[in-house]
């Protein structure tokens, strides 16, 4: 079975073709700010990104013939984890999503390309809005603002299943804390195959990250909102996009920050250590959700390649549970394997409503 995988990100479009479990093509096409700035809204990039996929297939001599097309899921309504067919309800909710992110293009592009092929379904799997929270985890200090969760569900669940397989058990039999360290940082508590607690890693909860502010002092935030200094859009950027490390240090480049630290930059050292401190504190808090009975802590994402960060993080959290590190992201493989599982009848295809 041949699967086409499409993963639009904020600064890249990732494309893969799988023949069963074997990758035939994996490409990561980077986009400059200038290249994307000609599109007023992210959704306006649809044709541009779709054509990139087609051009990449043609350039690599891959016939446009697939048994399924799967895209990275968008920021639709909260849904349980799993594989979903892209239907009209999902397309409409994606087009009118409350939050903007390039991932919203994944299912739309998958659906359009699949529609041009005979008997070819379009899927998404484990989008960032996967919501399996316990009811107690939904309550915030204000009924006006119930907790929502937006996190790296696809990568976290893929890493959880990989770890379980390595341990000779099943994801559904483990209690895990998983931390994805990337442009955003998400920390989720996985209990017997469900993420019963996770932060909103996109716009305003948890530790700060290379480009996101995380939890902020609410009173000060209100004062800034009414100061007249910023528009609504400018403030949103200062929470997600131009926040975190880039707000403090002018860059999201963690290796460059570490190099500056090694050359004696004390401010860079303080800010990066503060991010590590906040991540560790959040992981420690997550352990209380499981009453301290944690089988393992899994660290993943692009920043997990950094020995500087991982060693300092381990120093703070190693007393909680065994730590396993899975650098990078397994999103393309995970999407492909989810599509294969659906085609083979091993995974149920859920209906988005």
Curated annotation (Swiss-Prot):
SUPFAM superfamilies: Actin-like ATPase domain (SSF53067). Its EC number is 2.7.2.7. GO terms for biological process: acetate metabolic process. It is found in: Cytoplasm. Pfam families: Acetate_kinase. It catalyses: butanoate + ATP = butanoyl phosphate + ADP. Transmembrane segments: none annotated. Belongs to the acetokinase family. It comes from Bacteroides thetaiotaomicron (strain ATCC 29148 / DSM 2079 / JCM 5827 / CCUG 10774 / NCTC 10582 / VPI-5482 / E50). GO terms for molecular function: acetate kinase activity; ATP binding; butyrate kinase activity. PANTHER family: ACETATE KINASE (PTHR21060), BUTYRATE KINASE 2-RELATED (PTHR21060:SF3). Its main location: cytoplasm. This is Probable butyrate kinase. One of its GO terms (cellular component) is cytoplasm. Keywords: ATP-binding, Cytoplasm, Kinase, Nucleotide-binding, Transferase. PROSITE patterns: ACETATE_KINASE_1, ACETATE_KINASE_2.
């Amino acid at each position: 079975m041949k699967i086409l995988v499409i993963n639009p990100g904020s600064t890249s479009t990732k494309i893969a073709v799988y023949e069963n479990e074997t990758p035939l093509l994996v490409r990561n096409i980077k986009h400059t700010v200038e290249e994307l700035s000609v599109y007023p809204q992210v959704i306006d990039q649809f044709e541009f990104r779709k054509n990139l996929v087609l051009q990449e297939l043609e350039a690599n001599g891959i016939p446009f013939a697939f048994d399924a097309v799967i895209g990275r899921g968008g920021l639709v309504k909260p849904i349980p984890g799993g594989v979903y067919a892209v239907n009209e309800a999902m397309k409409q909710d994606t087009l009118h999503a409350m939050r903007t992110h390039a991932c919203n293009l994944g299912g739309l592009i998958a659906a359009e390309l699949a529609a041009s092929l005979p008997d070819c379904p379009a899927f998404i799997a484990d989008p960032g809005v996967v919501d399996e929270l316990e009811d107690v985890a939904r309550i915030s200090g204000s009924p006006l603002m119930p907790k929502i969760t937006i996190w790296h569900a696809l990568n976290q669940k893929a890493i959880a299943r990989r770890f379980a397989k390595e341990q000779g058990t099943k994801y559904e039999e483990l209690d895990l804390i998983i931390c994805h360290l990337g442009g955003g940082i998400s920390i989720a508590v996985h209990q017997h195959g469900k993420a019963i607690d996770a932060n909103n890693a996109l716009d305003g909860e948890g530790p700060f990250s290379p480009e996101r502010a995380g939890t902020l002092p609410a009173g000060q935030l209100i004062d800034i909102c009414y100061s007249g200094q910023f528009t609504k859009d400018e403030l949103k950027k200062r929470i997600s996009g131009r926040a975190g490390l880039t707000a403090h240090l002018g860059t999201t480049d963690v290796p460059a920050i570490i190099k500056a630290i090694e050359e004696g930059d004390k401010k860079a050292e303080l800010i990066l250590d503060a991010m590590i401190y906040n991540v560790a504190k959040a992981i420690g808090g997550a352990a209380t959700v499981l009453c301290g009975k944690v089988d393992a802590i899994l660290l993943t994402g692009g920043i997990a390649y950094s020995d500087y960060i991982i060693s300092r993080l381990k120093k703070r959290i190693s007393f909680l549970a065994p730590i396993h590190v899975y650098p990078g992201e397994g999103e393309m493989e995970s999407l492909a394997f989810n599509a294969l599982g659906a085609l083979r009848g091993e995974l149920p295809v859920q209906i988005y409503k």
